Amino acid sequence: MTLRSILHYPDNRLRQLCPNQTEYNDDLRKLISDMFETMYHEKGIGLSAIQINVITRVITIDVSKDKNEKIVLINPLILEKREPIVFDEGCLSVPGFYEKVDRYNYIKYQANDIEGKVFEAESTDLLAVCIQHEIDLSLIHI
C-alpha cells in the first residue's frame, strides 16, 4: 500500500471527466488498496480516484466508525433517488470547507465490483450522500 497525495481545489486536474474503468487486474487492486490507505490517513469517509490524479471511475468508501466496512464502487451509476435532503458536506480536496448540498437520502445504484461483475444495491443516509458526492467528483461536479 502506498499513501498518495490528494489534489486540492482549484487544481484543474480535478475537472477532468473520468472514463469508465475497463481493466480489472492487479493494478486496479493496488489502486484500491492505495485509495483506502490514503482515505483513512486523511480521516475521510470517501475517495474518488480523480482526487489522487488517477483518471478513472473508481470510488472507495467506509462510513463506519471502526473503519472496517470497506466499499468499492467501480463505474457507479445512480438508477433511482428519493427523499431530497440538504446535507452539510466536506471534501478531502477542499480541506476545511463545508457547504450545504442538495442530495437524496435514498439511492439505488449500479456499479462493478473489483472483478468487473455488475451489481445493484440500495443505500440510505450518510452512505447514500457519500456515494452521490464521490460520483459527482468523477463527473466534474466539484
Regions found by a protein language model. Name each.
Residues M1-I140:
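Positively charged
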